[in-house]
Amino acid sequence: MLILFMESTMKLFELQSFEEGGLVATERGTPSPCLGEVVIKVQAASINFRDFMIAKGLYNPMLSLPMIPLSDGSGEVIAVGNDVKDFKVGDRVSSVFWQDWNSEQATRMSSTGCEAAGVLSEYAVLPQTAVLKIPDYMSYEEAATLPCAAVTAWTCIMAANIKAGDNVLFLGTGGVSIFGLQIAKAMGANVIITSSSDQKLERAIELGADTTINYKE
């Protein structure tokens, strides 16, 4: 086991109930990696609407509590299990939404930030299948926004075989739509996006939207 220096305890946020005030700042012992695991020092994390739904008990009301929320984060590898070959101490990585999704169907129990512990903590221990290296040109903050919304948008665009010149419609201005807008524009598509907010549509235009529709007008 290779370990960079880390504190014996860590700070984290823990969802202890679905009631108001259920998200509590606390401390735990800093985890050590088992076989097949890495420990990252979390540098950035982002919030998706799913995280809000989880905290309210609307996503999985039977979820076992307490748990550490948030699926999307990035950080530096500071410890690796003895059998880990693809990652080393010092690597910059981001989390992966489905921790066990390789060649087989992902299982719900591997969902980061829900059934599996999330990244709203100083340190996170994750299976080596649950992290990806991030390129040098990308900041931790940028990488922390990608695992859920951006990958969803990318998957949809790839599945639809979008090409330059195609017309692509995005409904709303949530995370998936905003990432989809930028990816589709990078591929040369003509992007149409909807919202009930003129302010949000102005932002969409700044990001490259060709046509905007306020569906309340």
Regions found by a protein language model. Give the residues of each.
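Short, Lys/Arg-enriched N-terminal segments with co-localized hydrophobic residues
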Residues: 1-9
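Glycine-rich beta-strand-centered segment in the early N-terminal region that forms part
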Residues: 30-45, 58-100, 117, 135-138
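Cytochrome P450 core scaffold surrounding the K-helix E-X-X-R motif
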Residues: 50-55
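NAD(P)H dinucleotide-binding glycine-rich loop of Rossmann-like/cofactor-binding domains
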Residues: 96-171, 206
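Adenosine-nucleotide cofactor-binding segment
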Residues: 167-173, 185-217
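N-terminal Rossmann-fold NAD(P) dinucleotide-binding loop
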Residues: 177-178
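Short glycine/threonine/proline-enriched tight-turn/helix- or strand-capping micro-motif at secondary-structure
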Residues: 20-29, 58
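Conserved SAM-binding loop of SAM-dependent methyltransferases across substrates and taxa
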Residues: 182
